[in-house]
């Protein structure tokens, strides 16, 4: 009897008799609605495509083809180069390029948060993607910590009316209770607007002094 398609048998089969096959299930993309921040688009979040680690046996070619068939035009990757090697997808960024997907690589340490200058750069690039109506996806390793943090920051960046807790709740409703995983990420989100304002102010002051 064939198991239900929703069960990924490679995760449950402990037999050593057969080599572990790649998972056949399509990569799961969660779509965050941006209507509350006055954008009609959705932002995609997912786990690392092609990942081979412990019980996870994804196929990099199939996953990338799936993203392309979903119409993904831009992808933001928050894994470090070291992680891409560890999870056996060292050429993922090149593969995206081969498929014509614009790649934005902003490495953030696992469990961590970007410095405010890097985060501001990510926000500005994401906003340009949305303004140009480009179908955009973001991912880290599990699609829960760094990706959800960046998505929550985007909600705060695009709207003054969304509170940090509302942003967290939106991501946890979408990705589960594991979204925004560490105290560092939680605190970062609550301090985001103040740090962003200070960063933009200092950047503006520097720009004025240079132009004199």
Swiss-Prot record:
Gene3D superfamilies in UniProt: Protein tyrosine phosphatase superfamily
A cellular-component GO term for this protein: nucleus
Region called Interaction with CDK2, residue ranges: 1-34
EC number of this enzyme: 3.1.3.16, 3.1.3.48
The UniProt record lists the keyword Iron: no
Region ranges (Disordered): 1-23
Subcellular location: Cytoplasm, Perinuclear region
Catalysed transformations (reactions): O-phospho-L-tyrosyl-[protein] + H2O = L-tyrosyl-[protein] + phosphate; O-phospho-L-seryl-[protein] + H2O = L-seryl-[protein] + phosphate; O-phospho-L-threonyl-[protein] + H2O = L-threonyl-[protein] + phosphate
Source organism, top-level taxon: Eukaryota
Domain Tyrosine-protein phosphatase: 32-201
Entry keyword set: Cell cycle, Cytoplasm, Hydrolase, Protein phosphatase
GO MF annotation: an example: protein tyrosine phosphatase activity
Start-end of Polar residues biased regions: 1-12
InterPro entries: CDK_inhib_3 (IPR008425), CDKN3 (IPR022778), Prot-tyrosine_phosphatase-like (IPR029021), PTP (IPR050561), Tyr_Pase_cat (IPR003595), Tyr_Pase_dom (IPR000387), TYR_PHOSPHATASE_DUAL_dom (IPR020422)
Coiled-coil parts of chain: none
Positions annotated as active site in the UniProt record: 140 (phosphocysteine intermediate)
Biased composition (Acidic residues): 13-23
Subunit structure: Interacts with cyclin-dependent kinases such as CDK1, CDK2 and CDK3. Does not interact with CDK4. Interacts (via C-terminus) with phosphorylated CDK2 (via C-terminal helix). Interacts with MS4A3 (via C-terminus); the interaction enhances CDKN3 enzymatic activity.
Family note: Belongs to the protein-tyrosine phosphatase family.
Function recorded in the entry: May play a role in cell cycle regulation. Dual specificity phosphatase active toward substrates containing either phosphotyrosine or phosphoserine residues. Dephosphorylates CDK2 at 'Thr-160' in a cyclin-dependent manner.
Protein name: Cyclin-dependent kinase inhibitor 3
């Amino acid at each position: 009897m064939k198991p239900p398609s929703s069960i990924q048998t490679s995760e449950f089969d402990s037999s050593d008799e057969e080599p572990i096959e790649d998972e056949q299930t399509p990569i799961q993309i969660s779509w965050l609605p941006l209507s509350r921040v006055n954008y009609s688009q959705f932002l995609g979040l997912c786990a690392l495509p092609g990942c081979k680690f412990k019980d996870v046996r994804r196929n990099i070619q199939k996953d990338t083809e799936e993203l392309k068939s979903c119409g993904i035009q831009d992808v933001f990757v928050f894994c470090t180069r070291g992680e891409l090697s560890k999870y056996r997808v060292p050429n993922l960024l090149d593969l995206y390029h081969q498929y014509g997907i614009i790649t934005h690589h902003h490495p953030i340490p696992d469990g961590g948060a970007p410095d405010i200058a890097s985060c501001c750069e990510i926000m500005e690039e994401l906003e340009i993607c949305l303004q140009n109506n480009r179908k955009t996806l973001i991912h880290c390793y599990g699609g829960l910590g760094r990706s959800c943090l960046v998505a929550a920051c985007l909600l705060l960046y695009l709207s003054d009316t969304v509170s940090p807790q509302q942003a967290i709740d939106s991501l946890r409703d979408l990705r589960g209770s594991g979204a925004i995983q560490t105290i560092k990420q939680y605190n970062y989100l609550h301090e985001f607007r103040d740090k962003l304002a200070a960063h933009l102010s200092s950047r503006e002051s520097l720009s004025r002094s240079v132009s004199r």
